[in-house]
Amino acid sequence: MGVEPFAHDPAPSELIHSVPACGSPERRVMRPMVREGWLADRQHSDRRGRGRERFLPVSWDAALDLVAGEIRRVSADHGNAAIFAGSYGWTSCGRFHHASTLLKRMLNLVGGFTGHVDTYSIAAGPVILRHTLGDDRACGGQANTLDSIAEHSQTLVVFGAMSPRTAQSEAGGIGAHHLETYLRRIVERGVRVILVSPLKDDLPDWVAAEWWPIRPNTDTALMLGLAGEIVRSGRQDSDFLARCTSGSELYLAYLRGEGDGRPKDAEWASTITGLPAEAIRALAGDLPRTRSMLTVSWSLQRAHHGEQPFWAALGLAAVIGQIGRPGGGVGYGYGSLGGVGAPFTIGKSPAMSQLSKPINSFIPVARISDMLLNPGGPYSYEGEDRRYPDIRLVYWSGGNPFHHHQDLNRLSEAWTRPETIIVQDPMFTATAKRADIVLPASTSIERNDLAGNKRSDFILAMGQAIAPLGEARSDFDIFNALSGKLGVAAAFNEGRDEMGWIRHLYEESRNHAQRHHHFEMPDFETFWAQGHAPCPVQRDHTYLAAFREDPGAHPLDTESGLIVLGSATLARLGYADCGPHPAWIEPAEWLGKAQAGELHLISHQPKGRLHSQLETAEASLAGKREGRDEVMLHPDDASVRGIADGQTVRLWNARGACLATAQVTDSVAAGVAILPTGAWFTPAEAEGPELSGNPNVLTLDIGSSAFGQGCSAHTCLVRIEAHAGDAGDAVRIYDAHLAAILPT
């Protein structure tokens, strides 16, 4: 089996060369299995045996009977809200064999489930933008397109990142990677680019950006300081503020320091961010004079008070007054996924329906440990007072919370609370190891599917390349068989098999393009034979252009119909951690109140794998030493700790500890450590550190605020020291532990 790039992709990802590794038996779930203790005692088993007890093989029919029996038992005894349908995962970009969607489709047919809202990638940001911009399209790829920015912007301020590293992938797949093309056009035009980030590599070096190595979690203060300087010098666009915003008087009063006596100026911002006041003041003078675009990566809102940088960026853009003009304004998430900012589909993307929901039970996605540890406990979300459901059954398909959740030691404790945990996955992830029932799903190269989404200009055929390994079945086949056990197969499959559904989903997109956009896509046979079909797309898009021209005729879906800079809704709610205007609120952990020796840990996306996927492929292994991921340290921070490049180090705080390999580089700001996510959770057998370099044993598991409840992974202080002794190879240790609990 070989791999070659898509012919229409100008900058294909190197990750495609890791795809054949999916066909390897290494760490694959090869047959249905049940934890020994659970098989003996079912819901009364010792739940601390998860991850420790041996698995026993069972037939597919027996496994499906057990799963169907648990769904029926929990539904009858505790109600369907006691079933948690996992969150989501990147197990496949296929839109038909989309494991999470198919699980929820099946469960909706038998009474429903508790689900989730928002994502680990982005939660606080969309919540605040829904109330201040009326929707979250600006962070989902429908702000100014990159082609418009490349042709019209004169000053580009990148808060966080705009990196091809994080733009390699896209939910639903991506046909063409456009980011590098537009970045090179930006360079060609001589656009001034400023990168505000603790990591210099968050833009390619050939962009030659000015690097502003900001303290993590302080971007809000910089945005407020820039806006305050513009207002202080009288260069704000008063006409735009009057016509297109509401509550601006509250926001402007805060910038002037009328409430707290401290104007938000360059000196104030400098003391918080660590950036020179002179540079802040100079940039504040330049932004209104040039066509200026602000971009904010999703990473900024994965922090305590993560709503604030998204709202503060909107406030700064409103003060500058270029929202709705080509190459001006603000946008979110460029580079966070491959399709954000690219020409976006205006047609219908292929997608399976979850069907209607019999119950509306959900949690904010990153509050899973809170839910499991505090059944019935109160919490707030988006202005509503809610209570956590009492979860008895967890069914997780195609996801790995022991990768993407925070404070994994706390999650490990929470994981002992449900009566039964079912995991359906191709791989024996750390989550699958901690299941009661494990069902082997096929990978995307072992079945037919199609890919496509709102941020891609193609629908792609995904033809089966190899036979499924072992006894693996496709997600559709698993849920179809399970639906039969539950008596809802006809409603689940609607009389279609795999290829019948793929044809149906494609034809829906094709007919929509023809009917609504007079765009001709090839018939299904041609599409399947050539492997792709173009979609109708919007190019050279300027976000909010019509609104700027006539706000009355094109109102936003906000409390005022305008951009909200002072919110009556948030004023009424009275949250201390998310007030009525953009504001600097100290995070729970940051360098401004660090103890001696503490560093700020950032856990960003890895280069050599997709989150925790493709962990065993060569590209991922090449970024490890002794099976451990590398943590980036500034030379000064390494020197004072006696740490050499390539040395094993221990990172720790009150929440946990892990080992990693030191990578000493001046590309990271002093006081900051950067350890990528996705290493497979490998706790030591005895009390000791996690061995693979998984940063989520260290990260903070609190909501961004009572309003947004997003994850706060980037609010994290740690200590680092050289590790003495031989810790062994983490990859081999994981494999040895897995072998010990699998059937012989």
Curated annotation (Swiss-Prot):
What cofactor is needed? Mo-bis(molybdopterin guanine dinucleotide)
- Which Gene3D superfamilies does the entry link to? 2.40.40.20, 3.40.50.740, Dimethylsulfoxide Reductase, domain 2 (3.40.228.10), Dimethylsulfoxide Reductase, domain 3 (3.90.55.10)
Q: Please give the coiled-coil regions recorded for this protein.
A: none
Q: Would you say which domain of life the source belongs to?
A: Bacteria
Listed GO CC annotations: outer membrane-bounded periplasmic space
Q: Name one GO molecular function term.
A: molybdopterin cofactor binding
Which free-text remark accompanies the cofactor?
A: Binds 1 molybdenum-bis(molybdopterin guanine dinucleotide) (Mo-bis-MGD) cofactor per subunit.
This enzyme's EC code(s): 1.-.-.-
Classification via Pfam families:
Molybdopterin, Molydop_binding
Binding locations of Mo-bis(molybdopterin guanine dinucleotide): 121
Q: Does the keyword Iron-sulfur apply?
A: no
Q: Which GO terms describe its biological process?
A: anaerobic respiration
What keywords is this UniProt entry annotated with?
A: Metal-binding, Molybdenum, Oxidoreductase
Task: Report the function annotation for this chain.
Answer: This enzyme may serve as a scavenger, allowing the cell to utilize biotin sulfoxide as a biotin source. It reduces a spontaneous oxidation product of biotin, D-biotin D-sulfoxide (BSO or BDS), back to biotin.
User: What family does this belong to?
Assistant: Belongs to the prokaryotic molybdopterin-containing oxidoreductase family.
- What is the protein's given name? Biotin sulfoxide reductase
The record lists the organism as Cereibacter sphaeroides (Rhodobacter sphaeroides)
